[in-house]
């Protein structure tokens, strides 16, 4: 609902609704994804000799086979490299690939950041894999232990949080990074070097334009403790939560609009000069607004006819008759301006009409 509702009902994790939620109601939030990197191992790792390629892979291949269950050490979205020699740690080609799918011992890849294409250079049998969190370039290195926790004999408190427009409904481009928060802390009393609160639920709550924190990762059993003497539970894989369940509300009734606009009734406490009727546009709604303006005597209502009266009506005489008929149903007043046209315009920022 709002920040106060969040503080009262969710801010300590009592809501049991997952780890993050969209900041406001509506289907728009279904486009969001929140990803976290809670440890150095989640940020970057080199696989062991038991997790190497099981067989060579040719130029152009988009799938590789590995020795053991890849889901235990790779994650969809990881950016990976292959060693140049068998069992080596010579990751010298500079070629990077992103994991798009994992099925046991088969890993599907695309070139990164290109987003398509397979291997540029053949990979040798038993090549080792170095993986890195997909959003490593959005933050300041691997999370570790903050200076605040170090001075209090704590460790492993840092965490990165990134908010993604997964489906593109917010920014227009799927996968856009909307916000990134580097080296926040799991310690409830944490402060940044500048003295600001650095506890990650509080930072997200206070600064994010898109999401609220709702709860800790269930594996982070002591996250939220004070820093002193706490070795924060290591979660060695990145996490991601694609938000869902958001629904747009139904159209407001005239009664609901009346209750909302009546907040403007008191001229002594609310300053308003222009009252816009908005897209509802019913005669009853406009009449309610005129009542407010006439009682205040210091503002004017602006109202338009019904969209169906003028839009897609090809005959101008019919349009005129429709507009006159609509406004004939509304009482005369000196506190309202009635217009008659709808403007078809281009939004160059969103590339829509």
Q: What are the roles of these predicted feature ranges?
A:
Residues 1-48, 75-100, 110-353:
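A glycine- and small-residue-enriched flexible loop/hinge signal that marks low-structured segments
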Residues 62-66, 104-116:
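A generic structural motif
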Residues 57-59, 101-104:
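Generic beta-strand structural signal
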Residues 47-57:
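Disulfide-bonded cysteine-rich modules in secreted/extracellular proteins
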């Amino acid at each position: 609902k709002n920040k106060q509702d969040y503080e009262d009902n969710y801010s300590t994790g009592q809501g049991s609704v997952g780890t993050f939620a969209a900041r406001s109601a509506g289907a728009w939030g279904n486009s969001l994804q929140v990803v976290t990197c809670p440890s150095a191992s989640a940020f970057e790792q080199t696989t062991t000799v038991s997790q190497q390629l099981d067989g060579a892979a040719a130029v152009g291949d988009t799938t590789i086979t590995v020795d053991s269950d890849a889901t235990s050490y790779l994650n969809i979205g990881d950016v990976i490299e292959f060693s140049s020699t068998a069992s080596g740690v010579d990751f010298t080609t500079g070629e990077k690939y992103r994991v798009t799918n994992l099925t046991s011992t088969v890993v599907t890849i695309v070139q990164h950041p290109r987003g398509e294409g397979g291997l540029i250079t053949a990979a040798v049998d038993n090549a080792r894999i170095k993986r890195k969190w997909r959003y490593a370039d959005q933050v300041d290195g691997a999370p570790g232990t903050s200076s605040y926790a170090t001075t209090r004999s704590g460790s492993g408190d840092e965490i990165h949080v990134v908010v993604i427009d997964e489906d593109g409904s917010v920014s227009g481009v799927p996968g856009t990074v909307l916000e990134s928060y580097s080296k926040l802390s799991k310690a409830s009393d944490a402060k940044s070097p500048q003295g600001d609160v650095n506890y990650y639920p509080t930072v997200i709550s206070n600064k994010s334009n898109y999401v609220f924190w709702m709860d800790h990762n269930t594996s982070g059993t002591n996250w939220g403790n004070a820093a002193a003497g706490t070795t924060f539970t290591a979660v060695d894989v990145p996490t991601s939560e694609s938000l869902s369940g958001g629904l747009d509300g139904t159209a407001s009734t005239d009664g609901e609009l009346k209750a909302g606009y009546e907040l403007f009734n008191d001229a002594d406490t609310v300053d308003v000069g222009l009252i816009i009727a908005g897209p509802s546009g019913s005669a009853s709604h406009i009449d309610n607004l005129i009542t407010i303006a006439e009682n205040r005597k210091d503002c004017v209502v602006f109202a338009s006819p019904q969209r169906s009266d003028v839009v897609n009506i090809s005959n101008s005489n019919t349009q005129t008759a429709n507009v006159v008929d609509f406004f004939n149903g509304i009482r005369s007043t000196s506190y309202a301006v009635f217009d008659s046209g709808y403007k078809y315009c281009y939004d160059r920022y969103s590339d829509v009409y």
